[in-house]
Structure formats: C-alpha cells, structure tokens
Amino acid sequence: MSKIIIRGARILGGEPGDVLIDGETIAEVGTGLDADGATVIEAEGQILLPGLVDLHTHLREPGREDSETVLTGTKAAAVGGFTAVHAMANTFPVADTAGVVEQVWRLGKESGYCDVQPVGAVTVGLEGRKLAELGAMHDSAAGVKVFSDDGKCVDDAVIMRRALEYVKAFDGVVAQHAQEPRLTEGAQMNEGIVSAELGLGGWPAVAEESIIARDVLLAAHVGSRVHICHLSTAGSVEIVRWAKSKGWNVTAEVTPHHLLLTDELVRTYNPVYKVNPPLRTEADVLALREALADGTIDCVATDHAPHPHEDKDCEWAAAAMGMVGLETALSVVQQTMVDTGLIDWAGVADRMSFRPAAIGRLDGHGRPVSAGEPANLTLVDPAYRGAVDPAGFASRSRNTPYEGRELPGRVTHTFLRGRATVVDGKLA
C-alpha cells in the first residue's frame, strides 16, 4: 500500500504538523514524521481539512446528462475539495424507488472521484400526493437516510407529517425545500424594492418562512428530524433559532451564493443570477452569515444545479433556475466567513464536513484528522487569489455567477480514502 506524508500543513488551521497516510487510513499525526518510500507533499502555509461533505448536490443523472453526469459532477466535487456528496432526487426518472437510488449509488462507486450518497424522494414523482418507497430506499444497497422533494416543496401538511413519522423509525431525515407554491406563482426574483423597480414578479420571504414554521412544529409534534434546505432569509433564521431554543431536532443549511450575492445583481438581467430560492437583500445575507457563525445554521451546502448553456442563454423569464457551485464553494466560504473573521478554519471543517456528515448519518466522512481515521482529506492554499474561469471547470455545465470574479483560496489536493483525486489543483 502507498504511503503519503503531508508535511507542515496547518491542521484545521492550527499549528503546523505532519500527517502520514498509509493505504486508506491516517496512520499518524505529529511533527517530523518519516516513512520509508513515502511520497512527501510539502504543505507549508496550507490548511488541512477533513474531506468536505455536501448535503445538497444535483448530479442530474439519470435523465439530464446534457447538464451533468455522476462522473462529471463527482470530478467537480473532488476539485472543490469534496469527498462525499448527496445526490438530489429530481432526476428522470425520479429517485423514488430502490432501483433508481441504487443506480445512482452504483454510478458513484464507478466514478471513483468521491462518494455519492443518493437522496430519496419524499413523494412519488415529486408530485406531493403519495409517499414514495421510503423504507425500501433505506433498506436498499444505497442505504438512503436523507429524503427530499427538493426543487419542489412538500406543501401538504399531512404528507409532511407522515413522512416525518415514517423516517423516524430508522433515524432518517426529511430535507424540506421550503416554498409555499401558492405564494410564489409567477415569481421571478425576491420580492422587494428591486423587484418593484424592475417590474418582475416577487418571491416573498414569507413563502419560505411559513413552511419552515409549519415544519419545525410538525417535527416537534412527531419527535422526528427535519432539515431545512437552502435557508435564504433573516426571518427563516429567526424561526430556526427559536426551534433550536426549544430543543427540537431541526437543522438547516445555507448555500455559498446566499452568503455573498444579493438581489441587486438581478438589475443586470443576467440569468446566471436566477436561482431558487432567489437572491435576497444585503440584510438577509448578513443575517445568514451571522447565523452560520453562531451555529443557528448548521452547515454550508452547495445546491450545485448545473444547466446546459441554452437553458441560461435566454431572457430572464424563460431561464432555468440554478447555479453550479461545487468548484467555488470553499472559496466563497473563505471570503465571506473566514476572511471576515466570523469563523476560523476549524469552523469551516465543522460547517462543511463534520456537521453535514452527521446530519446525513454518513459513515467514514466528517471524521477528525486523527490516527486510525479514514484518509478523506482536503488541502487548501488560503493565500491563493484568482479569477473564476468556468472554461476550466470539471463540471459539464458553466452556469456560475462568479465568472471573472476574484476569489480567495484553492484546493491543491483531495484524498479519498488515501488516494489522491486532485493533485496541484488538477484531477489526478
């Protein structure tokens, strides 16, 4: 088995140290480490993190391989420092049966760039009327633990209650896309001053907040776990904070783009900024950052949503919603959270590895950088500065809102169970 020494890295941003990888496992952590025949990576000034975990990725396969495949999506994940991603269920066919989630799981095994944990649909066909085969998906080879109709809201309170009751039996979690559909009909962007000035249909904050309020109450009533996808408003933060103060089993995520971008960008009418939930106000952005820093929001999730060029190269109203995010997520978090002093690199490890792995009950990921642990690791150069060039993306799609924007930090190496998937910033 191969041996690798990562020398002089700041482990979780702390003091410099060495890590010896032997095969698939971290063999030793210390200083001045040596091993016969080991490959040495000089990592002075770099940050060593546990491999990143994404709770919210759209890999599009099966059905929309024109925008992404499991192979290209996991390549993008590795470049971004991720060693595990959760693949959302809004594929064609929908991942609402054991057969489809096992197909996605096997494609992930074959890709080899990161682990793929399928997310099962809550309802048949994402139609919100009948529970999908939750138990069968959990008992399948894919071992599904997270269920979501993401892209659509489980807006029927009875269906949501039944889903929460069902997954409680095996410690699963329902991840809710909080969007009251009757309040967002025809909506094109955040409802506010900018939407009024542009004459675009507004997407009110209460459409998100009302569903979150309902669902934290349902979760408390049932005694089950609920996870809120892509929190985007200050009001949503307050509801989650209140629910947590009650001791209820509620977790939440925020996307990198909601930590940085605002609805002012919609003035450009560039569809690259069209996303669900929409970009909100500066006040919302600041509230989300504070909530991620204080733990009200548990983790960062990319909501990586690739689209082919033609789905974005059109007028705003006709454009698809979504942004790619796997390859830029860590840089955006560094800019908005680390460089601003809101969290340190240990906080990044917590919000982008430990907590998402714990929420997804994902074995082997989100583990300490310690002897005996799986060698799922990410090495980051925080001093790097560079403009985002989507032409160099590993993802099949290019719909990034950051094209040409200078972002800090770069993943130099990613290790999946001791095997380098990224070396010097490039796929191995």
Feature map (PLM): residue ranges:
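Histidine-rich, glycine-flanked metal-binding segment
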Residues: 1-51
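Divalent metal-coordination and catalytic microenvironments
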Residues: 9, 24, 45, 56, ...
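Metal-associated gating/positioning segment near the N- to mid-region
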Residues: 46-111
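Active-site mouth loops of central-metabolism enzymes
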Residues: 55-68, 89-91, 117-130, 151, ...
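A glycine-rich helix N-cap at a beta->alpha junction
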Residues: 106-122
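Histidine/acidic residue-rich metal-binding segments in metalloenzymes
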Residues: 131-300
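His/Asp/Glu-enriched, well-ordered alpha-helical/loop segment
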Residues: 197-225, 272, 293-294, 298-300, ...
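C-terminal cap of metal-dependent C-N hydrolases
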Residues: 315-318, 371-426
